[in-house]
Amino acid sequence: MAPKKKGKKGKAKGTAIVDGVAPEDMTKEQVEEHVARIREELDREREERNYFQLERDKIHTFWEITRRQLEEKKAELRNKDREMEEAEERHQVEIKVYKQKVKHLLYEHQNNLAEVKAEGTVVMKLAQKEHRTQEGALRKDMRVLKVELKEQELANEVVIKNLCLKQAEEITKMRNDFERQVREIEAKYDKKMKMLRDELDLRRKTEIHEVEERKNGQISTLMQRHEEAFTDIKNYYNDITLNNLALINSLKEQMEDMRKKEEHMEREMAEVTLQNRRLADPLQKAKDEMNEMQKRLGNHERDKQILVCTKARLKVAERELKDLKWEHEVLEQRFIKVQQEREELYRKFADAIQEVQQKTGFKNLLLERKLQALNAAVEKREVQFNEVLAASNLDPTALTLVSRKLEDVLESKNTTIKDLQYELARVCKAHNDLLRTYEAKLLAFGIPLDNVGFKPLETAVIGQTLGQGPAGLVGAPT
């Protein structure tokens, strides 16, 4: 710290007259003393000059450092601005690139859709064309066979008549055998279908009954658990409230006892004071009694401090009681809200499962009806074909040719039936995937599957292997 300037201006003015005496009138001692003071003042001025020079150098150094730091910060700021501009340019370039990629993806998606639609149309047209070609070929073959049959009838009437009798007998036998076999097969498969339908109906009713029982049991158990939890919480807070009330009452009783003790001590102190005034003569006895009273007074002060602490504890207990009541109300509201959310989520899940099961059952019913209609059509075509063969009296070669063509037609129909069975399996797989998705959602929301109340029924198709992949990945029919 710089030394203080003491009387600098006064000293400057006192060079002419020092202590009321001119320099020429001073003695040697006065002059020496004056010179010593001037030297001290000169040394002090030199110290101040050196101090101010150091301060000036420090300030100049600080200014240089600050100026360099300012230039560095400006350079950093310019670099940051340049980096921000470059980053913005790169960002704009990336945005353009991503927009271009999105355009390309949209274009490819549209092209793929158009190709898929075109392929589907072409496949459908080819299938229709193939069916028309097969139908024309069959009609043409029938006409050719009729022409050949007429030619053979004209050329070999006698042989044909004899053969017709034999063939009629054999055809009658074969027809009777075929009709008997058809009736047996129909009766057999009707019986199997009826048994299978009855078994499936019984299984479905049993599973529905079990699901309803489990659901009702779980709902009652869950409601009982919630009621028990609510009763426990209510009893817990009631116990806390009763304990706090008991504590408050006990503290109030203690405070009342302290107040009574304080009044009693004050009365005793007043009595002692009166006795002290009356009994001034026996001084030693009065001193002893005074010491005893001082001890009692100290006890009284301690009792007052205990009373203050008790009041503070009473206030803290009242605040805790108020906080616990508020927490109890908040927990009751949260419990009611959580119960309402659980009931709403359970209702939505049950509605969604019921809707999905209805849709899936309807689709399965439609596919089964289509399959039954195709089977009936195939059986009808077989009967018609047998009747045509019986009426046409074809030779074995022509019969073999017609049978082969009929087998091709039947194979195409069987392929259609397999496709329908595959479609039915795919729908069942989609239904099962939807059930697993709902189960995953329930687990994600923190709802255990056991608390749902029922187990959704997964569907299966006889002859199909339902994998664990997406709905489109269904195993081939076995």
From Swiss-Prot:
One of its GO terms (biological process) is positive regulation of protein localization to cilium. Residues 1-12 have a biased composition (Basic residues). Residues 24-207, 242-426 form a coiled coil. Transmembrane segments: none annotated. The keyword Ribosomal protein does not apply. Keywords: Cell projection, Cilium, Coiled coil, Cytoplasm, Cytoskeleton, Flagellum, Golgi apparatus, Microtubule. One of its GO terms (cellular component) is extracellular region. Induction: Expressed during serum starvation or contact inhibition of cells grown in murine fibroblasts. Its main location: cytoplasm. Residues 1-114 are annotated as: Regulates microtubule-binding. InterPro entries: GAS8, GAS8_dom. Residues 1-29 are annotated as: Disordered. Residues 115-258 are annotated as: Microtubule-binding. Residues 357-478 are annotated as: Interaction with SMO. Highly expressed in adult testes and lung. Weakly or not expressed in other tested tissues. It is found in: Cytoplasm; Cytoplasm, Cytoskeleton; Cell projection, Cilium, Flagellum; Cytoplasm, Cytoskeleton, Cilium axoneme. The keyword Cytoplasm applies. It holds the Pfam family GAS. GO terms for molecular function: microtubule binding; small GTPase binding. It comes from the Eukaryota. Component of the nexin-dynein regulatory complex (N-DRC), a key regulator of ciliary/flagellar motility which maintains the alignment and integrity of the distal axoneme and regulates microtubule sliding in motile axonemes. Plays an important role in the assembly of the N-DRC linker. Plays dual roles at both the primary (or non-motile) cilia to regulate hedgehog signaling and in motile cilia to coordinate cilia movement. Required for proper motile cilia functioning. Belongs to the DRC4 family. Component of the nexin-dynein regulatory complex (N-DRC). Interacts with microtubules. Interacts with SMO. Interacts (via coiled-coil domains) with RAB3B (in GTP-bound form). Interacts with DRC1. Interacts with DRC7. This is Dynein regulatory complex subunit 4. It comes from Mus musculus (Mouse).
